[in-house]
Swiss-Prot record:
GO cellular component, one term: nucleoplasm
Record-linked PROSITE patterns: PWWP
Organism of origin: Homo sapiens
Domain of life: Eukaryota
Record-linked SMART domains: PWWP
Record CDD domains: PWWP_HDGFL3
GO molecular function terms listed in the Swiss-Prot or TrEMBL record: growth factor activity; microtubule binding; tubulin binding
Name of protein: Hepatoma-derived growth factor-related protein 3
Tissue-wise expression: Detected in testis, heart, spinal cord and brain.
UniProt-listed Gene3D superfamilies: 2.30.30.140
Comp. bias regions, Basic and acidic residues: 169-178
Tagged with keyword Cell inner membrane: no
Compartments in which it is found: Nucleus
Length: 203
């Protein structure tokens, strides 16, 4: 199907916006707040439903929502996409500040959990990184995963190191005991066998 001719959009228009690497996403043409940086020529400020992210896109990457709802409005497994479809239908006036309020609430919850032990808090911190990473774009998510694995490995190494040293000493001592006992046990077996032979020869 041929692309539609680029057209003029105004603030508040509902569209599907296409960015490289992402499906056609439910979005809204935003108005520029006073004092904001002006977008490049022929670019519109876009607010993406579901993720509440913003970008500047040209008219060739924008598709009117009503005309393309049947084509692009199918549910998708990408995080935030289905929420975006719901928002564009039920709450098209949602503002970016709503997302910031959610972030502030989650950061205050994080501060309130400071009384946990070191191991428990590091595990929970790793979970938080993963949850936060799901809402981010693909390249940012990879960085979060690295952080998570790095912190969890670091904490597990520290927790293994102190008890592990004692365990290693205990294991070595037990090995020495068992090897010396094993030698005696082997001698005992030989003695027992020779004793049996002597006994059988004597009878």
């Amino acid at each position: 199907m041929a692309r539609p001719r680029p057209r003029e959009y105004k603030a508040g228009d509902l569209v599907f916006a296409k960015m490289k690497g992402y499906p056609h996403w439910p979005a809204r043409i935003d108005e520029l707040p006073e004092g904001a940086v002006k977008p490049p020529a022929n670019k519109y400020p876009i607010f993406f439903f579901g993720t509440h992210e913003t970008a500047f896109l040209g008219p060739k990457d924008l598709f009117p929502y009503k005309e393309y709802k049947d084509k692009f409005g199918k549910s998708n497994k990408r995080k935030g996409f289905n929420e975006g479809l719901w928002e564009i239908e039920n709450n098209p006036g949602v503002k970016f500040t709503g997302y910031q309020a959610i972030q502030q609430q989650s950061s205050s919850e994080t501060e309130g959990e400071g009384g946990n032990t070191a191991d428990a808090s590091s595990e929970e911190e790793g979970d938080r990184v993963e949850e936060d990473g799901k809402g981010k774009r693909k390249n940012e998510k990879a960085g979060s995963k690295r952080k998570k694995s790095y912190t969890s490995k670091k904490s597990s190494k520290q927790s293994r190191k102190s008890p592990g040293d004692e365990d290693d000493k205990d294991c070595k001592e037990e090995e020495n005991k068992s090897s010396s006992e094993g030698g005696d046990a082997g001698n005992d077996t030989r003695n027992t066998t020779s004793d049996l032979q002597k006994t059988s020869e004597g009878t």
